[in-house]
């Protein structure tokens, strides 16, 4: 392939009369604002006749399968819905064209119509809860969907043959400035011991990228008459599910159990290294993952960054991580278990992707380089070089692609089974 121009994703309706074009599939949440969802829809005016073309953006939280009419609750909740009448253009929906829209309209012709959505910054990022091996249907989680369809009005039943549905993602990247180095300490006084046991732990930094090892520095000062028999280090994912009420689910994603001992009246210092990988946690039902991709293309869910004053009640899933250091202390003495207790501290940290570098508008590709995506379609080039790629999003195991809503939810994992 020669010069590579601006990449644009496209998807057509089954009857080919409606095609949506988007400049990207991932839209970045910058905390204070979110990238606008801007694109165009190409329509066949002869097919439309008296009908209109609408485009909707929906953020939905799918929290379980549809059971036998339990209190009339459905299995999904729309957190945000916005509608635009793209054709014929409605005056109230008219917005200034973005550079991408100008170029697409110039290339596609007069029957290409723009649409733009603003995503509120307090909506959740795209998160999928990992389905179990036996689960079928759509997985639980938060997703964003752009839908274009032909109808006489918004209330009319949407037919699959003349509609287009595209799943996009709202993502966050690691901030450029990390927070303070995580440290924690605690002191425990035991019965029958004059002096305490002191545990201090720290991480080498506050922000880790996915796949990066986490170094945990553990320092123990044992002035008691008891022995520390074992040291347990774990990385835990916490998912706050904010829907009808708030519930927190925790899941270990990396663990190490060391047989290191600390004798009475002695000190101990060691650095432990753990690396949380999705590959080691594939069977954990309900684990929070980034977006809606296949296992090979996704990872553990990134930490959620919240702006000050964010309304936690409308945020579907808030993800955070902590390292827990636990000392297992020997049980002995006349009082047995009453005279001993485990000692633990927790270290919060951030797990995210680094902000990707901005790609230049034109990039030279060596002639012997094999294209990554075989669905890439390059149309005739001109001064506004645009490369169209089929909009295809590989799904997590157990997901459906563009099924009718009434088919959704069968066998989805339930939050209360996590």
UniProtKB/Swiss-Prot annotation:
PROSITE patterns reported in the protein's UniProt record: ARRESTINS
GO biological process: G protein-coupled receptor internalization; negative regulation of interleukin-6 production; negative regulation of interleukin-8 production; negative regulation of NF-kappaB transcription factor activity; negative regulation of Notch signaling pathway; negative regulation of protein ubiquitination; positive regulation of cardiac muscle hypertrophy; positive regulation of ERK1 and ERK2 cascade
PTM annotation, UniProt: Constitutively phosphorylated at Ser-412 in the cytoplasm. At the plasma membrane, is rapidly dephosphorylated, a process that is required for clathrin binding and ADRB2 endocytosis but not for ADRB2 binding and desensitization. Once internalized, is rephosphorylated. The ubiquitination status appears to regulate the formation and trafficking of beta-arrestin-GPCR complexes and signaling. Ubiquitination appears to occur GPCR-specific. Ubiquitinated by MDM2; the ubiquitination is required for rapid internalization of ADRB2. Deubiquitinated by USP33; the deubiquitination leads to a dissociation of the beta-arrestin-GPCR complex. Stimulation of a class A GPCR, such as ADRB2, induces transient ubiquitination and subsequently promotes association with USP33.
Keywords tagged on the record: Cell membrane, Cell projection, Coated pit, Cytoplasm, Cytoplasmic vesicle, Membrane, Nucleus, Phosphoprotein, Protein transport, Signal transduction inhibitor, Transcription, Transcription regulation, Transport, Ubl conjugation
A GO cellular component annotation in the UniProt record: cytoplasmic vesicle
Ranges for region Interaction with SRC: 1-163
Residue spans of biased composition, Basic and acidic residues class: 355-366
Record motif [DE]-X(1,2)-F-X-X-[FL]-X-X-X-R motif, residues: 385-395
Positions carrying Phosphotyrosine: 47
Region named Interaction with CHRM2: 45-86
Superkingdom of source: Eukaryota
SUPFAM superfamilies (alphabetical): E set domains
Record flagged with keyword Cytoplasm: yes
Annotated region described as Interaction with TRAF6, given as residue ranges: 318-418
GO molecular function: angiotensin receptor binding; arrestin family protein binding; enzyme inhibitor activity; G protein-coupled receptor binding; GTPase activator activity; insulin-like growth factor receptor binding; molecular adaptor activity; transcription coactivator activity
Region (Disordered): 353-375, 397-418
Positions annotated to bind 1D-myo-inositol hexakisphosphate: 250, 255, 324, 326
Cellular compartment(s): Cytoplasm; Nucleus; Cell membrane; Membrane, Clathrin-coated pit
Phosphoserine found at: 412
Annotated family: Belongs to the arrestin family.
Record text on subunit structure and interactions: Monomer. Homodimer. Homooligomer; the self-association is mediated by InsP6-binding. Heterooligomer with ARRB2; the association is mediated by InsP6-binding. Interacts with GPR143. Interacts with ADRB2 (phosphorylated). Interacts with CHRM2 (phosphorylated). Interacts with LHCGR. Interacts with CYTH2 and CASR. Interacts with AP2B1 (dephosphorylated at 'Tyr-737'); phosphorylation of AP2B1 at 'Tyr-737' disrupts the interaction. Interacts (dephosphorylated at Ser-412) with CLTC. Interacts with CCR2 and GRK2. Interacts with CRR5. Interacts with PTAFR (phosphorylated on serine residues).
Comment text on domains: The [DE]-X(1,2)-F-X-X-[FL]-X-X-X-R motif mediates interaction the AP-2 complex subunit AP2B1. Binding to phosphorylated GPCRs induces a conformationanl change that exposes the motif to the surface. The N-terminus binds InsP6 with low affinity.
Protein name, entry field: Beta-arrestin-1
């Amino acid at each position: 392939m020669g010069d590579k121009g601006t990449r644009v994703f496209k998807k057509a309706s089954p009857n080919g009369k409606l095609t949506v074009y988007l400049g990207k599939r991932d839209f970045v949440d910058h905390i204070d604002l979110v990238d606008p969802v801007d694109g165009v829809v190409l329509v066949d005016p002869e097919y439309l006749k008296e009908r209109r073309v609408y485009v909707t953006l929906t953020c939905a939280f799918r929290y379980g399968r549809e059971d036998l009419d339990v209190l009339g609750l459905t299995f999904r909740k729309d957190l945000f819905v916005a509608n635009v009448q793209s054709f014929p253009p409605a005056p109230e929906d008219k917005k200034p064209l973005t550079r991408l829209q100008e170029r697409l309209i110039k290339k596609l012709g007069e029957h290409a119509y723009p649409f733009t959505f603003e995503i509120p910054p307090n909506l959740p990022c795209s998160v999928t809860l990992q389905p179990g091996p036996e689960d079928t249907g759509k997985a639980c989680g938060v997703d964003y969907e752009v839908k274009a369809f032909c109808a006489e009005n918004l209330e009319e039943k949407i037919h699959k043959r003349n509609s287009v549905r595209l799943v996009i993602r709202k993502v966050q990247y690691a901030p450029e400035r990390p927070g303070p180095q995580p440290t924690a300490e605690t002191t425990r006084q035991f019965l029958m011991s004059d002096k305490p046991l002191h545990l201090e732990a720290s991480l080498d930094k506050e922000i880790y990228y996915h796949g990066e090892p986490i170094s945990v520095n553990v320092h123990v000062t044992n002035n008691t008459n008891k022995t520390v028999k074992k040291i347990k280090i774990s990385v835990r994912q916490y998912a706050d599910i904010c829907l009808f009420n708030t519930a927190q689910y925790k899941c270990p994603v990396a663990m190490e159990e060391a047989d290191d001992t600390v004798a009475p009246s002695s000190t101990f210092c060691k650095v432990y290294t753990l690396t949380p990988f999705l590959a080691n946690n594939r069977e954990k039902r309900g684990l929070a993952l980034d977006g809606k991709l296949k296992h090979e293309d996704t990872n553990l869910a990134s930490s959620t960054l919240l702006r000050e004053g964010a309304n936690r009640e409308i945020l579907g899933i808030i993800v955070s991580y902590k390292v827990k250091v636990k000392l297992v202390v020997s049980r002995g003495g006349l009082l047995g278990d009453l005279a001993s207790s485990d000692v633990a501290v927790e270290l919060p940290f951030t797990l995210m992707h680094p902000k990707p570098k901005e790609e230049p508008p034109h990039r030279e590709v060596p002639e012997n380089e094999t294209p990554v995506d075989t669905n890439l379609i390059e149309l005739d080039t001109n001064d506004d070089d645009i490369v169209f790629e089929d909009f295809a999003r590989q799904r997590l195991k157990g997901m459906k692609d563009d099924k009718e809503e009434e088919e959704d939810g069968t066998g989805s994992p339930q939050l209360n089974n996590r």
